[in-house]
Amino acid sequence: MVHVSDEEIQSYLSMRDERDRFEFYFSLLERGYRFAAQTHDIPVDEFLKLHQQFRDGGYKNERLFKKKMIRDYGIKVLLEHVLTQYAYHLRLTVTDLKGKYINSGYIYTTYPDDIFFNKNVRKLLVTDKTLMITDFIDKPQFECQLSDLAAGIIRSVCLDENTRKYIPNDDNKEEFAKMRWDEECNK
């Protein structure tokens, strides 16, 4: 077990810079790796390399979800998962067929917990006029008009009533605000 002293806890609670907090989390993980490696075969160096990659990437957790070429509209779309400590975003980027950037924007934002987003974002379907994101049971969740995307307009409609409850809005904005501890929470 990794011990965290009262002094470390107090120091953590006073941190306002997110990089300081990230480094605190990493320090705990790294202590845990080294402790576990005393009795188990743990690839500590590999974990440390992953931490460094995360640091080098600006502490961002982003990964490609899907990409699709839509020849009839002359575009390619990329959907990426973007997870921060404050929110999960589904980012849609549109390029022309040669890869020239057209526009990018978030089409879904929710709580930073995979319980909220993982089941809602599973498949990408293209119909004659729409780009649709479905959930794990193929129920439509979000829809974008292909004509909008081809014109560089990034917007979506949430098609699922339950999913809409977890998108920031006037009814839940205080819940989202409670998650922030950085300089944004003091404005």
Predicted features, each with a name:
Residues 1-31, 114-187:
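Acidic, small-residue rich beta-repeat scaffolds with periodic aromatic anchors
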Residues 20-68:
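Long amphipathic alpha-helical scaffold segments
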Residues 67-72, 81-83, 120, 136-140:
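Eukaryotic scaffold repeat domains enriched in small/polar residues
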Residues 75-78, 132:
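Structural core positions within WD40/WD-like beta-propeller blades
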Residues 85-93, 139-145:
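Structural motif
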Residues 88-90, 106-110:
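Cysteine-rich, disulfide-bonded extracellular modules and peptides in secreted proteins
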Residues 98-100, 137:
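Solvent-exposed strand-loop boundary residues in beta-sheet-rich modules
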Residues 103-108, 155-159:
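Beta-propeller fold detector
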